[in-house]
Structures are given as C-alpha cells and as structure tokens.
C-alpha cells in the first residue's frame, strides 16, 4: 500500500468534505421553503396559491374543502406577525399557561377578509373538528392564532402547530362555565380557515 498516495487522497477528500460542510450559507432551493401550516380560503381579497388539487391536497379534500384561490401561511409568516400573549387556564391540566401569537382578526385582515361583524369564519383542525363563528366573536373574544405555549413552539401531535384560542378566564360568560366547556370554539391543530361573507 502506498501510504503517501493514501494520505494525500484522504487529505484531499477531507478538504473537499469540510469545504462542502463548512458552507453555512448555501441555500438549497428545494428545501428552503417552510411547509404550509395554514390555508385561508373563501371570501378573501388576497391569495398566494391557486385552486385546491384533490390529488395532492389530500387532507383538505377529505375534509370537503374547495377553493379556486387561497392564502397560505408557513410558521415564520404567522410567528412573525405582531404577537399577543394570553394566560388562560387550560382544560387539559386545569393550570394557567402562557400562549402567544397574532390576533386572528389581524391575520384575517391580512388576507383581505370582509370587515363586517357577521362574516362567518370556519376554523378547521387536522382531526376534522370544525367550528363556525363570526368575525364579531373573533374580535370580542380576542382570538389569537397561538404559535407558542409557555415560550416553546406548539408541536404537531400536541396542541399545534397552530391553535385558535382565547383567554376564557377574561371573558365573564365563558369563565362562568365549567372548564371543559370554555374552549369549544378553539380548535387546536388548526390548519384551515374558511371565510364566508354574510
């Protein structure tokens, strides 16, 4: 075995590998974009994607969602909006937790949803749970699209990645209800919002 040739080849291979691994700012476009976490459709003025593709938008199609245009958000685009922090007592452990994220009304304004208070808003979770409310209720209850729980990003498989939620402790008619009944309008794992003009 020629040790010199072996060592030279190993050194060159090591230099090439360290050069490749040392490039921290290399951008791989195929992996650069964050995945979409939230799709807003219906009566909105702004869109950034085309129609639902029944073959590739499987979860949306299974939940009978249809649209010609929609506005999609990834985690950075939601988490990057102006945040609100709330501290409701949660039904799952009967303890107060800190939740933060943008106001749902701000997110709806960003996509150009109608400003009328009787605009219908459907919030849909990945497990198929869906609730309908109005923009008036969204505003009155100060719904947030929570991205963080106790300072950590909400996880898929937990209560996230996004949770439409309000501080039920600060809403007298909800605070008077049993804990298990306070959050019926708050789907965790929210992934789709349908806006219907009144």
Where are the regions that the model predicts?
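N-terminal export signals
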Residues: 5-23
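N-terminal intrinsically disordered, low-complexity segments enriched in P/E/S/T
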Residues: 21-198
């Amino acid at each position: 075995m020629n040790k010199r040739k072996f060592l030279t080849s190993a050194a060159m291979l090591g230099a090439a590998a360290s050069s490749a691994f040392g490039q921290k700012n290399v951008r791989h476009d195929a992996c650069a974009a964050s995945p979409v976490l939230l799709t807003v459709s219906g009566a909105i003025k702004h869109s950034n994607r085309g129609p639902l593709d029944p073959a590739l938008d499987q979860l949306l199609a299974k939940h009978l969602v249809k649209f010609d245009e929609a506005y999609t958000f990834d985690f950075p685009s939601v988490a990057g909006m102006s945040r609100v922090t709330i501290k409701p007592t949660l039904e799952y452990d009967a303890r107060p937790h800190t939740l933060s994220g943008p106001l749902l009304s701000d997110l709806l304004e960003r996509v150009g949803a109608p400003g009328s208070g009787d605009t219908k808003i459907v919030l849909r979770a990945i497990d198929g749970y869906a609730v309908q409310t109005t923009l008036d209720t969204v505003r009155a209850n100060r719904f947030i699209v929570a991205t963080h729980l106790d300072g950590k990003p909400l996880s898929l498989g937990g209560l996230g990645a996004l949770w439409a939620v309000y501080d039920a402790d600060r809403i007298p008619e909800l605070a008077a209800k049993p804990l298990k009944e306070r959050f019926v309008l708050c789907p965790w794992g929210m992934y789709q919002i349908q806006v219907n003009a009144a």
